[in-house]
Amino acid sequence: VRMWQKYLEKAGYKTAYINAWELDFATNPLVSILGEVGSLTGKGRKEFKKIIKALPKSVRLGAEGFISTYTGQEAIKNLFNRHKSFDEDITSYCDQKEALQQFRSELQNFIEVNCGGKPLVFFIDELDRCRPDYAVEFLERIKHFFCVDNIIFIISVDKRHLAESVKGHYGSADIDTDDYLRRFFDIEYDLPTPEI
């Protein structure tokens, strides 16, 4: 993976390498991803600051559902519901949707300024070795980047181990992990086992 990254860098591509296993202490994978984007700023420091400014609202996207779903604590969900009316929920949804669009727009602008017309390539390594909750959250976070032009994610994983993480995270051996993971991977390539 590192050789591929160096090859692309020599060809003029901006790349970022993320060893997810080393970073699974973080509570929010998006922070790790954007930290790597920040290291590529070059002449786009101003554009990067706009991305960060748009970030806080977009990070809240789905936070209430995440808390109640993944902690299993209905009381937390009820706490949110007691303090919101239906109109406030709709307004909040619209604000979050707008913030996510703004985040994507600022990220697109950053790529245009910094990447010379070429894609920004993220190499994600060791995701299959992470805690199941972090691995799934990482995938769920990067999906928000998929509709931004000129971003490519190359994810190096042992798919069998990642599938086990998905099963462990959702607490079900019956989940169709191939179907779930297909949402995140457009092209798959299996490396042959080396003959020693």
Go through each PLM region and give its residues.
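The catalytic "switch" region of P-loop NTPases
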Residues: 1-7, 104, 109-120, 131-196
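P-loop NTPase nucleotide-binding core
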Residues: 3-111
